[in-house]
Amino acid sequence: MASVKDLEPYASNEPGLVDVLLDFKATMPNPIVFKVVGYQALTFEDVTQGDALYSRASDGKVGKAVANGTLDEATVAGFAETTVTSGNRVRAIVSGQVPTSQTLDAGDLFFLSATQAGRVVKTPPSTAGQYVTPVGEAANTNELIVRIKRPILLR
């Protein structure tokens, strides 16, 4: 056991930080899992892979979120991992990376759409009474890095 170096503390300087990062990289799973956090929920309408979802307060079922409705409808509760029909279970991804049927521009920030339920847009809503709900950043042309924030009501 005297030869085991893994348990020794890292130096509190730049080489120590580099050692920490190298060890961290060496212990990461391969491939890295991007769909980190999600949950199963029943849908009350048809949803398409990548749709932004909200949870209906009356029964907890999920459907397409939209920024021009109520606070509940503008509060994104996750993104549909797959396409399902009404009454079926869908996995809602709340953290990580999710494929979408939309064409995205890598690196751009996205917001919940006020005109198309379930969709995301680069330009946030700007009309009084609508909500601005930041939802994430495009990883590439068809995947969104999920970073859901609370909706902000425009006045």
Please report, for each region that a protein language model flagged, where it lies by residue.
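A signal for long, low-complexity, Ser/Thr/Asn-enriched, surface-exposed stalk/shaft
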Residues: 14-29
